[in-house]
Design a protein with these regions (language model features):
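A ligand-binding cleft/hinge motif common to bilobed small-molecule-binding domains
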Residues: 100-109, 168, 173-177, 204-238
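An extracytoplasmic/periplasmic, membrane-proximal ligand-sensing/linker region
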Residues: 32-34, 177, 218, 265-326
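N-terminal (or domain-start) structured segment
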Residues: 26-115, 155, 180-204, 297, ...
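C-terminal lobe and pocket-closing loops
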Residues: 126, 212-280, 309-312
């Protein structure tokens, strides 16, 4: 039996194994009815909005409705379980993101293994987080924050939207690489008190997703220090990267699409081709930029490789942090 990582990569490469005539027949008949995109988070977030953009694109390209269904709960695990159990016919898809990679080590009792039970289709967007501090603090740069934290060990706090979220893990990675002692304060979403506490200085810093932070930063309610990607963000190009000060640091959110394992390779191939076509469309590129993201094109094998690498990376951070969700 193949290990989960190898099986996931094998599923991604399986398209090439089908005869070309068979692949063409599958591609021409699909889709013949509406297709569900399952999203494991509430409507309105960056990943949800990006998935809706992609669903609309596929609806227009393939002549059938691709609609988003939000299945909220357990950091997207409920949604993943639903899709794993769905028929492998291409009519139920899931938005995968970095949370799924983190969950693999954060939860001990998952009933599924993404690397074994899903077939990668395509990645489509990468979005950085942004390191932002309270404007009440005398801190304007990443080095100044590190110096402040070292001068106040165990007294500096960072807010997140919950245990195991990308915001939490971004902070844990920063903590480890900077060699500082800062305390994690989880909220049920930053909008549920987290933003207010950082603004007033009750909590000192957060590593929030960029899209919901932009207006707060521009209004002066939060002070941005850097983005967590390896390159500057087009949405806020004036900000440096954390990696400028901590070489090797990277903690971007990313989004992609997968289907139940066993989905015909021709369907995976066609969906991948149509999604990649979106990145050549000026309107689509502008919509992704409006969400603070950059396109993330590639083959199913590319997405499988990204997911496997991210699963291993965040497993190390989860272990280092001691975080557990069950």
């Amino acid at each position: 039996m193949k290990p989960p990582r190898r099986k996931f990569l094998h599923l991604a490469a399986a398209t090439a194994a089908l005869p070309s005539v068979s692949r063409m027949a599958w591609a021409q008949s699909y889709p013949s009815r509406p297709v569900r995109f399952i999203v494991g988070f509430a409507p309105g977030g960056g990943g949800d909005l990006a998935t809706r953009v992609m669903a609309q694109w596929l609806s227009e390209r393939l002549g059938q409705q691709f609609f988003v269904e939000n299945r909220v709960g357990a950091a997207s695990n409920l949604a993943t379980e639903q899709v794993v159990r769905a028929p492998a016919d291409g009519y139920t898809l899931i938005q995968l993101n970095v949370a799924n990679a983190i969950n693999a080590s954060l939860y001990d009792k998952l009933s599924f293994n993404v690397l074994r039970d899903l077939a990668p289709v395509a990645s489509f967007m990468r979005v950085p987080n942004v390191m932002e501090v309270s404007p009440t603090l005398p801190i304007k740069t990443v080095p100044e924050f590190i110096a402040y934290a070292k001068a106040n060990p165990g007294k500096v706090m960072f807010a997140s939207s919950g245990v195991g979220t990308t915001i939490h893990m971004s902070g844990e990675l920063f903590k480890a690489m900077a060699g500082i002692d800062i305390l994690h304060v989880p909220y049920r979403g930053l909008a549920a008190g987290g933003y207010a506490d950082v603004m007033t200085g009750m909590v000192h810093v957060t590593f929030d997703n960029l899209p919901p932070s932009i207006e707060l930063i521009r209004a002066g309610k939060l002070r941005a220090l850097a983005v967590t990607s390896t390159t500057r963000s087009q949405a806020m190009p004036e900000l440096p990267t954390v990696a400028d000060f901590l070489p090797g640091y990277e903690a971007s959110a990313w989004y992609g699409i997968a289907a139940p394992a066993g989905t015909p390779a021709a369907i995976v191939e066609r969906l991948n081709r149509e999604l990649n076509a979106a990145f050549a469309d000026p309107k689509m590129k502008a919509l992704i930029a409006d969400l603070g993201g950059t396109p993330l094109p590639g083959s199913p094998a590319d997405f499988a490789k990204l997911f496997a690498e991210e699963t291993e990376k965040w497993a190390r951070v989860v272990k280092l942090s001691g975080a557990k969700a069950d």
